[in-house]
Amino acid sequence: MDPKLLDYYGSDAADVYLERARRTLAAAGLDPVVGMDFFSDQDGLLCGINDCVEILGGVLGAGDEAWALAEGSAMERREIVLRVRGRYSRFGRMETALLGILASCSGWATRAREVVLAAGGKRVISFGARHVHPLVGPTMEYAAVVGGCAGCATPGGARMAGLTGPSGTMPHAMILIFGDTVLAARAFDAEMPDDVLRIVLVDTFKDEAEEALRVAEALGERLRGVRLDTPRERGRVTVDLVKEVRARLDLAGHPQVGIFVSGGLTVERIRDFVAAGAPVDSYGVGMTISAAPPIGFTADIKEVDGVPRTKRGRIPGLPENPRLEKVL
């Protein structure tokens, strides 16, 4: 890991009392080997552990060790997901960063898993980067993929998740500038390489079903799908609208054209689409994933120089968790 980033995690991004503790302990000549356990306050899907291991790998020294659950593991409330045994001076200042990474990433991944399960086997793409700070957008999308999303919108998120590339359609802005959906679709088709799916927005200017047919006639077999993103002001995308678009495409001889739904999708709305048998092929989900609340994590010292010791309310010593694997 970049030394400058490590320094940032241990200074500007760290709770100030950790630096004050480091200075006080150093002045007293105290640098014990401590055993510290990290655990969550609720069930969920663990994410961010790979980043934590990378951080620890940059600060731990000879004789220090770490164990962790695997990235993407299901975790239970109060289950130990990360254990570090090492000199406190080496890793203590990273506590804020380690907890924050686990909290945010696990919150996003857990919500993504809920969305994916609600979709009943249909593809879910993360569209949430526009709802978070750009410095964390790719990390959020990586967590969404860990949670089960089939793709994400940003190149950075796709790269972090090991995908072949980002997923996306086209913005309303481009269609508005062209002034006609078919003109925009033809220009897009002419410019984009073959590996970019031709999925066209059809809610900008005309009735969605009418526009879907116009685009299907214009692009023919090259059209992979139409995207319905009807805004709140027009009642959003409904089950009936999806069924109508599907029926009209089929009647016109375009059964290969899929239907991609986005726009304010929640877990409950997706469940409603599935329960009603709406012929949706893929969902684009944004804020429901990106605005997921973080999962609280705690880090406690449980052992000091081999002697069980912890704060009141906790059990001293390092309990066994057979799911932990040695990572450092």
Where are the language model's segments positioned?
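Ordered alpha/beta subdomains of enzyme catalytic regions
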Residues: 1-156, 160-194, 222, 298-328
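Glycine-rich phosphate/ribose-binding loops and adjacent secondary-structure elements
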Residues: 172-328
